[in-house]
């Protein structure tokens, strides 16, 4: 028994799959951003424990460059702000996509029950 799905249902299933893939991409991107944010926070915590006259080196390309602790903290604070903003943006996208996904899933389920009502629901064997 190989029934073909109605075109409308096929279209909705494709849209559902696209939403799921989009949600997965957003979740993965947010995970990367959150990981970077945790790393920046760790480095900032470590820097705050060091005396202000501590010599700090930063990797720039293939070089280690001596840098001022205050400059590094400022740079990391700026990076932290940007990462937090990006994380919130991804979180908002994720929430929106989850809502759209739930609505699309509900629509697909309604279409499935319309096109394929349960057979033998009232029949007894």
Swiss-Prot record:
Query: What GO cellular-component annotations does this UniProt entry give?
Result: cytoplasm; prefoldin complex
The answer to whether the entry has keyword Kinase is: no
Protein's cellular compartments: Cytoplasm
Answer whether the UniProt record assigns the keyword Ubl conjugation to this protein: no
Q: Which InterPro entries match?
A: PFD_beta-like, PfdB, Prefoldin
Q: What does this protein do?
A: Molecular chaperone capable of stabilizing a range of proteins. Seems to fulfill an ATP-independent, HSP70-like function in archaeal de novo protein folding.
Q: What is this protein called?
A: Prefoldin subunit beta
